[in-house]
Amino acid sequence: MKLSNKIACLLFAATAVVAASCENDNINPYDYNNNGDNNQNQGSTEVLKTAMAEYPVGSLVWTKDTTLTESVEIPVGTSLYIEPGVTVTCKSDVKVPVEIVVLGNLYCMGTAEKPVTITSDTKKPADWGGIICGYNSEEVVLNHVDLSYAGATPTESSPSFQNKLFKTTLDGGVPAFHFCNVNGKFVVADCFFHDVYNDQTYFTGGQGVIY
């Protein structure tokens, strides 16, 4: 099945149910590919092709392992695709906990054989924040994702706090995965959340499927 067809099937199911900095050189999460002109996460200006799939204009694609030393914010209108087998490691020894804030769309396309792994370097609960999806985030697919050691408390400089996505006071950690667009769609399929300090999932809106 083509990537686009698989995503469409997962999101159709959701509708039916409820009618950074990068330390390693192999991928820069702030560019749409390895030589992407410092576009600050704005996505590609042309169709992107990788060994796995072809992605539409406006895409960010992470094809290889990466280490985040600061938060990543995906703007409205931009889609981030994380390909099978990719490991994203969040550094814990930072002043502002790492968060993946999705104001656009996110597709973690792991498989049973090659899951997407999102973890931390020291492997302790609350090492990093979580995946926080904004009020305009239309689609999120987490397919075969192993997510661990999230739940850190945000600071006033955290993008989740500045965008008022979860906490308006600094009184506790963020969830490992939070979705809050009442008109959005999300799928969490064959995922493993573990060693998380706060809530594993938290939903304040949207149409979703979890299985």
Model-based region annotation:
Residues M1-C9:
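Bacterial N-terminal signal peptides that target proteins for export
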Residues A8-L11, Y30-D31:
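A ubiquitous, low-specificity "background" feature that marks scattered single residues
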Residues F12-A16:
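Hydrophobic helical h-region of N-terminal Sec-dependent signal peptides
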Residues V18-S21:
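C-terminal motif of bacterial Sec signal peptides marking the signal peptidase cleavage site
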Residues E23-Y211:
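Beta-strand/loop edge motif enriched in small/polar residues
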